[in-house]
């Protein structure tokens, strides 16, 4: 949820860190809120199946999808390959909007056994 809000080029930050000039760099952040929902494999955090086809990624339009436990199957399709499969990050004017965006887009992604927490960012909304 941090990198999507970073407006200063990450390379500039890395170079300033290496040069010892990070304190002089004006690091800028977007005012948008960000919420990330992790899509996990069925059985996670215990044992889970790998190699299950993942569908619906092309339908995600209003969120960023970060791959974690994914791989390309023998037939060239995207498949599950870990417990924490994908992170779906929604951005919005506030946390409520970012949360709504993340969950709406996460629902478009399909794979057998997919599950996720439904309470992400709820403490921040109280």
Cite the ranges covered by each PLM segment.
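Generic C-terminus detector
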Residues: 73-75, 79-126
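Short, surface-exposed, polar/charged, turn-prone segments marking secondary-structure boundaries
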Residues: 17-19, 62-67, 93-95, 116-117
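Active-site "cap" helix and flanking loop/linker of ATP-utilizing ligase/carboxylase catalytic domains
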Residues: 1-62, 73
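RNase H-like, Mg2+-dependent phosphodiesterase core
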Residues: 54-69, 88, 96, 102
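Hydrophobic side chains in beta-strands
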Residues: 39-40, 67, 90, 122
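Beta-strand->loop->alpha-helix junctions that form or flank phosphate-binding loops
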Residues: 4, 55, 64-71, 112-115, ...
């Amino acid at each position: 949820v941090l990198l999507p809000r970073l407006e200063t080029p990450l390379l500039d930050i890395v170079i300033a860190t290496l040069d010892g000039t990070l304190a002089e760099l004006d690091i800028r952040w977007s005012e948008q809120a960000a919420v990330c929902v992790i899509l996990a494999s069925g059985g996670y955090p215990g044992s889970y199946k790998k190699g299950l086809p993942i569908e619906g990624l092309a339908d995600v339009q209003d969120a960023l999808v970060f791959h974690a436990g994914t791989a390309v199957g023998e037939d060239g399709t995207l498949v599950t390959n870990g417990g924490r499969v994908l992170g779906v990050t929604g951005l919005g004017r506030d946390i409520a909007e970012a949360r709504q965006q993340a969950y709406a887009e996460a629902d478009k992604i399909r794979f057998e056994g997919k599950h996720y927490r439904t309470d992400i960012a709820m403490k921040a909304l109280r």
